[in-house]
UniProtKB/Swiss-Prot annotation:
Catalytic activity: dTMP + ATP = dTDP + ADP
The enzyme's E.C. designation: 2.7.4.9
Residue positions binding ATP: G10, I11, D12, G13, S14, G15, K16, S17
PANTHER family the record matches: THYMIDYLATE KINASE (PTHR10344), UMP-CMP KINASE 2, MITOCHONDRIAL (PTHR10344:SF4)
Record-level Gene Ontology MF annotations: ATP binding; dTMP kinase activity
Keyword match Transport: no
Keywords associated with the record: ATP-binding, Kinase, Nucleotide biosynthesis, Nucleotide-binding, Transferase
The name this protein goes by in its record: Probable thymidylate kinase
Length: 201
């Protein structure tokens, strides 16, 4: 039986990591493979260094994309072929949404171009949970975690959120948009319902 790929997306501070920890500790997902992007590989390390620096935006995209390709070939594809459930905290949609903003001064339709260079080799998720929140609230949350990255700025996150919602509108069969500015128990309930429905389908 072929496995499933479930991805968690959203702007920084939207609550993805909190939900990932919840799922990781839930008995229903004891046999699931939990992963994230950027990865912990040497390519992922290069991505983290780029995030903390003033690396050229196009070079940064290529690092993210290389990490994604390696992630698919070394972990995601083998796990899916073994029939496992894979849950990834960030995936290709993060690139479409974020670099679609950072590259808007470099090209006319950056998000479409980034999607094009992924076409034919990336694995499309069976389900993408998009955690949606007002960027101002998200930045406040990020500030409470300590030092902020260059991506954790309100103006940038407004554009990223718009890109995410455009992606969700184009693929309603794949995306489930979840409002995360509410009680955590309600969010967890909606997440479990969405994942259970896709696993049982």
């Amino acid at each position: 039986m072929k496995g499933k790929l479930i991805t968690l997306e959203g702007i920084d501070g939207s609550g993805k990591s909190t939900i990932t920890r919840f799922l990781n500790s839930h008995p229903a997902f004891a046999n699931a493979v939990f992963t994230k992007e950027p990865t912990t590989s040497w390519i992922g390390d290069a991505v983290y260094k780029a995030i903390q620096s003033d690396t050229d935006e196009l070079a940064e995209l290529m690092l993210f994309t290389a990490d994604h390709a390696d992630h698919i070939s070394t972990l995601i594809r083998p796990a899916i072929e073994e029939g496992k459930i894979v849950i990834s905290d960030r995936y290709s949609d993060s690139r479409y949404a974020y670099q679609g903003v950072t590259l808007k001064e470099r090209m006319e339709e950056p998000m479409e171009w980034i999607q094009m260079i992924h076409r034919g080799w990336t694995i499309i998720p069976d389900l993408t949970l998009l955690f949606d929140i007002d960027p101002a609230v998200a930045v406040q949350r990020c500030g409470k975690r300590g030092e902020q990255t260059k991506f954790e700025k309100t103006d940038l996150l407004k554009g990223v959120r718009e890109n995410y919602l455009k992606l969700a509108e184009k693929e309603p069969e794949r995306f489930v948009v979840i409002d995360t500015d509410r009680d955590l128990k309600e969010i967890e309930k909606d997440v479990l319902q969405a994942i259970t429905s896709i696993i049982e389908s």
